[in-house]
Amino acid sequence: MILETINSPADVKCLSEEQTATLCRELRCFLVEQVSRTGGHLASNLGVVELTVAIHRVFDTATDRLVLDVGHQCYVHKALTGRRELFDTLRQFGGLSGFPKPYESVHDAFMAGHASDSVSVALGMARARTLLGQDYHVVAVIGDGALGGGLSFEGLNDAGGSGEPLVVILNDNGMSIDRNVGGLSKQLSKMRTDPEYYEFKKRYRKALEKLPAGPTLYEWSHEVKTALKKTLLPPVSTVFEDMGFAYMGPVDGHDVQRLTAVLQAAKEAGRPVLVHVHTVKGSGYDYALREPEKFHGVGPFDPATGKVRQAGKETFSHVFGETLRQLAREDRRVCAITAAMADGTGLTDFAREFPRRFFDVGIAEGHGVAMAGGMAKQGLIPVFAVYDSFLQRGYDMLVQDMALEKLHVVLAVDRCGIVGADGETHHGCLDYLSQIPGMTVLAPASFAELRQMLRRAVLEMDGPVAVRYPRGGEDGYDGDCGDESVTVLCQGTDAAIVTYGILTQQALRAAALLAGEGVSARVVKLNRVAPLDSDGICRALDGVKRIVAAEDQLRAGAVGERLSALLLEQGAGTEKLVLRSVGTTLPSQGSTVELRHALGLDAEGIAQAVREVLA
């Protein structure tokens, strides 16, 4: 196999046209085989095989800077840069990350995980190169979905006018950008992606400049050319050229030789260039072609049938979606908003049943929050379902366009806490919502509590409300005490464990472990984590002087620190308080079980914290 001989990008550059085509076929087989075992982002990687190979044929990623937007399409890049043999550990604890990580390889220029930032990052690198007098090329790869994020246009607007040599590759796999129409347009696009065309342009301008009326002739011909482009080329081309980019494309993203030639021309252009590439998500694997969304992020599956090996388990996301549908039937003011994550957040069925009350704003969380504020202001009840780590992108709007006016917007915040295999960029471990004035934050620990809390948040409460819940399903606790702000689940006199959300079951198990050692541990569950119920917490902790606060959040500003301040202010007489949290840095990837154990947030870790507080 040719793939087995590829240990660095230098090996890719040496291949013949036939060998390169074979390599692409082998890479697709490799991707399907490996991801079927570990799970991961398959469809997007199948779509960029030829593009990634072409990038490595033209650029040297050991010195050049390759910035991948979102980053989940990095598998081919990793396979070609000396990490092929690590794929058995893909997205596993201590293994190969599913996203670019500079600590993994010199070929990973920048950590990625969220959308729309690649052009801004690439421009920063290009400007640093110029100011420091360095010599390297900068390439950003961004998808048409990420292009819908406002940050991408901020970056494009600045980059196009900067004059900095850099290449932006627009990976258009969603057909959301206007297509070129007609034979003449196709021929013109073909000409514009030919390196000889750009060499001719340089010679043409130099020749005209030698004539007495040369500058005038050049300006006239430039105006004629611009008018023709606007008539014959897809409108998207003129958008980028108006920003200051040289536009090359559209290019067949599965033609390695054509891609190589175009990228070489872009590399030599000496100015901002946008290369528009058409790819097909899931290319080369029929099941992913038919259901690209299913195979966007997929668990282990049978490659022969495309069936996921473990499917059908009920999740918090599913329960949220079903509950919101019921609430929408009861109240016509209820609307649902998502940011390009309808399936992931459990809103697919809602969209089918209530198409006029469902709004997918694309990868634009800030816009989603601000729009929800406008809807609430006019009397609707908007529910914005969004992943915790993605909602961070709309923080300013949470304050300015929602909280300051005390608007009744409900945030259904999915993937809170430790999320597992996607690692640092996807954990929901920043307790930023509790810092927002007037925000109520609820934390269900079971499906029953999610149903009850969501109903209260939508139909009974006022002002901004966030309901935070984890990825996946229940952890063994299936109680329903969500109507109280604080609940004592287990009585004890020696120490108290204060926790909330998905860690509730771990706290109960810890209390059981300690009981076997003769230690009486009280378990206090917080259902409302912001604002904290001072009186309720003090009553729940009455008589206990040693306390452990356990939460799957970064320590700074989270419940543990706020609980500590509350007890001090109330003069509760606490003798010792141990904060058991994620700590000060976001953890890498791994299963939830593995990460909890490593962080001391499983039953044994919490029990050990109680032993320490009693020592």
Where are these regions (language model features)?
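Non-catalytic terminal/interface segments that mediate subunit docking, oligomerization
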Residues: 65, 271, 279-391, 397-407, ...
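Long, well-ordered, tryptophan-enriched scaffold segments
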Residues: 14, 173-320
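Glycine-/acidic-rich phosphate or pyrophosphate-binding loops and their flanking alpha/beta elements
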Residues: 234, 261-264, 296-297, 315-330, ...
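Peripheral docking tails and interdomain loops at the edges
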Residues: 301-303, 308-312, 420-422, 440-441, ...
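Structural signature of the thiamine diphosphate
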Residues: 218-287, 408-413, 430-479, 603-615
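N-terminal amphipathic, basic-rich helices that act as targeting or association modules
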Residues: 1-80, 241-245, 252-256, 273-276
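A glycine-rich helix N-cap at a beta->alpha junction
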Residues: 86-96, 161-175, 196, 403-415
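Cofactor-binding active-site loop characterized by glycine-rich and histidine/acidic residues
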Residues: 41-162, 316, 333-334, 338-339, ...
